[in-house]
Amino acid sequence: VENLAVGDPVWTLDAGLQPIRWIAQRSVTLADQQRDARLCRVVFEPGALGPGVPAQRLAVSRQHRIWCGDWRAGLYFGQPEVLVAAKDLVNGGLVHVAPPQAAVTYVHFLLDGHQIVSSNGALTESFFPAALSLGAVDGAAREELFTLFPDLATLRLAFPKTARPVLRGREARLVA
């Protein structure tokens, strides 16, 4: 993800290749992480989500959502595919919170709609411009995003919903 740029095509589960419309990075210092543990990454070790998934270690923000396709999701929620925040999948083993590190850079990219993309072989979400996620983007990047997508400033962008239903903490534990 560190080498992606605006215009680069990204594979999506539902719409094939889609161009990146906007991309930004936010760096979090060691001091930031020590002050606020919520800024530490959630790490998925290889195989944490199933055989070979992810293929390599995957580190994401706590709120980044992971695709879960499981019979339990269908049984409990009537949807065979759901999105779950990384923090709700932490199990202290193959999915754990990383300790504060010298520097962590989060990369966000926006497509024409909310999509499911591949991250080290795991299915995760593209950036979803909602009030909570916009707070994760620094001021200059947020202004750039509002310039490119003016409706975002009032949260009226044509992203009517997420790519899959989103489970909350208690719900997520049923499929984790």
Language-model-detected regions and their locations in the chain:
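General structural signal for secondary-structure boundaries
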Residues: 1, 85-86, 167-168
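Non-catalytic peripheral regions of nucleotide-handling enzymes
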Residues: 21, 127-176
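Long beta-strand-rich cores associated with HINT superfamily self-processing modules
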Residues: 9-141
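Structural motif
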Residues: 2-9
